[in-house]
Amino acid sequence: MKNFIDTLNKAFESRIRLGIMSILMVNDQVDFTMLKELLQITDGNIASHISGLEKLGYVSVTKQFFGKKPNTSYAATIAGKEAFTKHIQALEQLIQTKK
């Protein structure tokens, strides 16, 4: 029997990263405020986890200004979408595994 645990991506072990990627998979782009509201986490938690996902190439970060107001938005990259899809598939296989 294949060990599906080994196919899970460690980048998505955190429930926060799992939440971030889940939101980004169904939205083209999400801004900081929306992500914070949806996940109910602190600014520091968002920044820390986004930074980790960005370093892996799974998330792109866009910073811009609307007038004088800064706006940061996030999107899943192609690599991020592929990695997250594989992670979800591994979870599904694990759930469907019979004894």
Give the role of each language-model region:
Residues 57:
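Glycine-centered, phosphate/nucleic-acid-interacting loop/turn motifs that mediate DNA/RNA or nucleotide
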Residues 1-5, 22, 81-99:
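Amphipathic alpha-helical dimerization/coiled-coil segments
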Residues 66-85:
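Basic, amphipathic "hinge/linker" alpha-helix immediately C-terminal to the N-terminal HTH DNA-binding motif
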Residues 3, 7-45, 66, 73:
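N-terminal helix-turn-helix DNA-binding core of bacterial DNA-binding proteins
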Residues 61:
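Short beta-strand "wing" residues that participate in macromolecule-binding interfaces
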Residues 49:
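Residues within the DNA-recognition helix of helix-turn-helix
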